[in-house]
Amino acid sequence: LVLCGAVPVYVNPEVDKRLGISLGMKREQVEKAIKEHPNAVAVLVNNPTYYGICSDLRAIVKMAHDAGMLCLADEAHGTHFYFGNGLPVSAMAAGADMASVSMHKSGGSLTQSSLLLIGPNVHPGYVRQIINLTQTTSGSYLLMSSLDISRRNLALRGRQVFHQVADMAEYAREEINAVGGYYAFGKELCNGNSVFDFDTTKLSVHTLDIGLAGIEVYDILRDEYDIQIEFG
């Protein structure tokens, strides 16, 4: 933002008060922001959020394009959307113009490696020029090799792997919710707007109903059960 001089306009999503997490962007919120700022050049959307919440990306892309704007997607946690049956729509399939995909998060490549996907409305030569101005021209061949190896692995096994992951996460959700006191949320949050879709490979567990904060459960699982979770 500093380098390009852009002035951001934030669309604040709703918050689920019970879970304490941000939801997706409502269609009417995006439409209102576009109408109030007709000179904006792009709309930036998370697909999904950290907790697996997805906005109505196809509708947002259409609104942006109808207003002469690009739609850019932060798909840091959505690598697997390109390989999963029954998973939310990927940014490029929804018609987004660019998507940053963190392959190292769920695609299996080395940390720091990611992909920038470009649609037909964006000139790749211009993107290359900007990249050369903002980062090293001496790229890491170790990271690039890991991206290519991971790409091949996903091309060959991605659908099978992520189908299995989704099944395992759904099984865990059912078992955790059967215990009582915990809430592993899933597609029941979907409301057709601020939660348009949900990433079923995500396993997030609300623990406050048993009197424990997430960080406390994190420490218990790690210290007493040798289970390392991602975030608490």
Could you describe each region identified by the protein language model?
Residues 1-2:
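Conserved PLP-anchoring active-site segment centered on the Schiff-base-forming lysine
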Residues 170-232:
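Conserved C-terminal alpha-helix-loop-beta "cap" of PLP-dependent enzymes
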